[in-house]
C-alpha cells in the first residue's frame, strides 16, 4: 500500500510520529504511517505557492487536459481504488467500485469541461474614456481537508474545481482513512507539474493546524464536523483566509399521507443506510403524517430488518462497519440515550453486532419527538428515527427547527404541495419523491451550521476564484 506523502512532485516518507491505520471490518492495523513534520507542511505549501506562478497562468485547455488524464488513470485503476476504500473505510467492495468510482471519475471530467467555460464579464464603458472588464482568477494555494466517510470522493470534489480554476492544492486526508488519497498522489504526480498537487498525512493538531494557518494558504476547504469547522474558522481568522465549509447534516424526510409508501420504504432503506449511514445527506430524520405513520413504521421496519451487514468483500453485503471504534461508541451512545427516553421504540436493530469489527445493526426508532436528541443531533450511523406530524405547517416548522441545513426531501403526489414545501425548507437541497441523488452539474452545499460554499457545478468552480475588476484608460 502506498504510504508516502507527495511534496513538490516527489513521494517522501513522513518525518513525524507514526499513526496506525485500521481495517474497520476486523479492527486490525493495516499499517502505520508517519505524519508530516512541521517542516514538511511548510515545504508542501511553499512548493504549491511556487508552482502557482506558472500553473495559475496556464490556459483552461491545459488544465482540462491534466484533469482528463487524471480521470482516465482513476478509471483504469478503479479496482485498486475500490479495494483500498473498502479495506480502509469498511465499505462493501461492490458499492465502492460500482457507485463511487464512476462518480469520482465523472467529477474530474465535469470540471475539465467547466474549466473551459468559466468566463469573466467583458463589460463596457461606465466612465468616458475607460473600459472595464471583470476577471475570475484563481486564489493561489488551497488547503483541502477531506473526511473519512468518502475519502476519495471528497478529495475529488475539492481537487477538481480548485485545479480547474488554476489553484494549487495541499490536500490533507483524514488520518483515519488516508489510503486512497495517498494512492491518488502516486498517480497524479506524473500528470501535474511538481507542486500543483501535494498530499500530506497526519492529525489535525500536528498537520491540519500548521497547514490551515500557513500564511501562504489563501483558502481552506473542509468537509467535516461543525466542531472542526468552528476550529478552522477561528484558527484562520487572524490571516483572513477564505473558507469553504461543508459541516454535516440531519436531513428531514417529510412523508405526507398521499405519498407512495412503497417508494418511501425503498428509498429510506437505501438512502438512510448507504455507507452504514455515514453520510451527511442520509435520509435519517423521518416525519410521517399521522394517517400513514403506523403503516410506514411497520413496512419500513420490516424492510430495514432485511439489510445485510457483513464482510466488505462479500457481494451480498449491504452495510459494512463504521469507520472506527470511537465512532461505533458514539453511535451506540446516541441510540442508548434514545432508548432511555421511554417513549422511543426500537423497531429493529438498536445494538452493536457481536464479533470483530466496528459493526452496528441497522436501526429504526419510532415515536421520536421533535426535541429529542436523536432528532436534533447528527448520529452519522445506520440509525433512522420516525416522528408523526399533523399538518403541513407543523412539519415545515419542525423540519426547519434544526441547526443543520444541508439536505431534505418531500414525499407527496401533490405537485402544488411539493413546490410549496420545497420553497420553505431551509436546506441547500430538497429532493421530491427521492433522496440522496447527486450529479456533477448541480451544486451541493448547505446553510446554517451545515456551512457555506458549493461543491460540484459551475457554482463550485466559482467558489475557487476571486472576482477582479480591470479598468483600461484609452
Curated annotation (Swiss-Prot):
4-aminobutanal can spontaneously cyclize to 1-pyrroline, and 5-aminopentanal to 1-piperideine. Keywords: NAD, Oxidoreductase. NAD(+) binds at residues 146-148, 172-175, 209, 225-228, 280. It is an enzyme of class 1 (oxidoreductase). Pfam families: Aldedh. Transmembrane segments: none annotated. GO terms for biological process: L-lysine catabolic process; putrescine catabolic process. Pathway: Amine and polyamine degradation; putrescine degradation; 4-aminobutanoate from 4-aminobutanal: step 1/1; Amino-acid degradation. Catalyzes the oxidation 4-aminobutanal (gamma-aminobutyraldehyde) to 4-aminobutanoate (gamma-aminobutyrate or GABA). This is the second step in one of two pathways for putrescine degradation, where putrescine is converted into 4-aminobutanoate via 4-aminobutanal. Also functions as a 5-aminopentanal dehydrogenase in a a L-lysine degradation pathway to succinate that proceeds via cadaverine, glutarate and L-2-hydroxyglutarate. It comes from the Bacteria. Homotetramer. The active site is at residues 246, 280. This is Gamma-aminobutyraldehyde dehydrogenase. Its EC number is 1.2.1.19, 1.2.1.-. PROSITE patterns: ALDEHYDE_DEHYDR_GLU. The keyword NAD applies. It catalyses: 4-aminobutanal + NAD(+) + H2O = 4-aminobutanoate + NADH + 2 H(+); 5-aminopentanal + NAD(+) + H2O = 5-aminopentanoate + NADH + 2 H(+).
